[in-house]
Every structure is written in structure tokens, then in C-alpha cells.
């Protein structure tokens, strides 16, 4: 099925790094990475994201933000985005990637996973739970 998966959010410092690392734990044989549509290039993961991930057994150590590009899109068979508007942004950057782009929250009734950047610890915890639920559902589908 899909052996290369790219997880995309806006800045690539909160949601997509968590999604990447969580999904990688669930699917160790897959090549999973992340990027942002408006990435904070070379920035480490947001400290609140690092903390909520750590509390849930996920390490974001070594993560550096990177920009989604048309060239990058060609390296992945499946692109999972956090919000519906990311699908349009991906299509604008790499029109050829539209057909392989889906919502990370696809199996949660096409749910957007909101951006917790600069929000409360509770917001990060809530977003982590959505990412966790979505990752578990994607892993189930991608193992089949």
C-alpha cells in the first residue's frame, strides 16, 4: 500500500511533528515525515508540543520545521493534512499532489485538527487526543 507518508500542518512545529512521530511508532516499517505549508523552517518543535508529546510517550527530539514544496510532494505516496484549507494550499503549491492528499482526521468524520499554537496546555492536550485517535485509525487502515 503506502510506504511513504508526509504529515502536513501550517508551521510544522506543533501538529505535524506529533502526528509524524506518533504514526511512526505505530507503523515502524513506513517512511513518515512532516512539513508545513507556512513552515517555521529549521525551528524546533514548539515547547508546548514537546511537553504534551513527552507526557504521552512521544519524543519530538531533533525535529526541525521544513517547508512543503512541489519537489517534496513527489517523494511521498500519501499526504495527510490537519485542516481542510491545507488541501487547497497543497493543491496550489503542488497541483499534482491533490489526488494523494487527505485529512489526518479523515476517519474522524473528516474532522479538522485545530492549530494549538500559542494556546493553553489544555488546547494542546485536546489536539494531542485528536491526533492520537486519527493516527490509530490511519494505522489500522494502512496495516491492512
Curated annotation (Swiss-Prot):
It catalyses: O-phospho-L-tyrosyl-[protein] + H2O = L-tyrosyl-[protein] + phosphate. It holds the Pfam family LMWPc. InterPro entries: LMW_PTPase, Ptyr_pPase, Ptyr_pPase_sf, Tyr_phospatase_low_mol_wt. The keyword Hydrolase applies. CDD domains: LMWPTP (cd16343). Keywords: Hydrolase, Protein phosphatase. The active site is at residues 9, 15, 115. One of its GO terms (molecular function) is protein tyrosine phosphatase activity. Its EC number is 3.1.3.48. It comes from the Bacteria. Belongs to the low molecular weight phosphotyrosine protein phosphatase family. PANTHER family: LOW MOLECULAR WEIGHT PROTEIN TYROSINE PHOSPHATASE (PTHR11717), LOW MOLECULAR WEIGHT PROTEIN-TYROSINE-PHOSPHATASE ETP-RELATED (PTHR11717:SF31). This is Putative low molecular weight protein-tyrosine-phosphatase.
